[in-house]
Amino acid sequence: MKPIIIDSEITFIPYYPDPDTALPWYQDLDVCRQVDNIDFPYSLERLQKMYAFLSTHGDCFYIQYRGVLVGDVTLRDDQEVCIVVCKDYQNKRIGRRCILKMIELAKEKGMDQITANIYPFNTQSQKMFLSIGFVKTGEETYIYQIS
């Protein structure tokens, strides 16, 4: 995979092991709750297992914003999209732009829909996904119909 330029501020960088950069994102308890509904930070082992899974079951990228890695996004082979933006960079419309690009990538792969699983308390993510065109189909399930 090659880097994918999203716009003048955001580039997807293909995943490579970089725990020194990524682990601090997953040390933030608010982010851990948003992502996994857990109240403890990721260990290095948990982070490595997560990325080992994501990078072998889909297209996994770091999100580079203005030259800084600020999160990750994956389009899984099972049509699920996963995204994390570290807290310091949330509310800058980074997630929205990344998910819109993931919809394009899903179309290119011939996927007919993509799903996102969002916890009921994560209203910030729910609003963003709904505003893009995802439809809530279950307590935590949101689907974007491509075809």
Per-region residue spans from a language model:
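Hydrophobic adenine-recognition pocket in adenosine-nucleotide-binding enzymes
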Residues: 15, 85, 118
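Conserved GNAT acetyl-CoA-binding A-motif
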Residues: 106-118
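Conserved catalytic-core motifs of GNAT/GCN5-like acyltransferases
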Residues: 117, 130-147
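Acetyl-CoA-dependent GNAT
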Residues: 37-88
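A short, well-structured alpha-helix characteristic of acyl/acetyltransferase catalytic modules
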Residues: 1-52
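Conserved acetyl-CoA-binding loop-helix of GNAT-fold acetyltransferases
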Residues: 91-106, 123-131
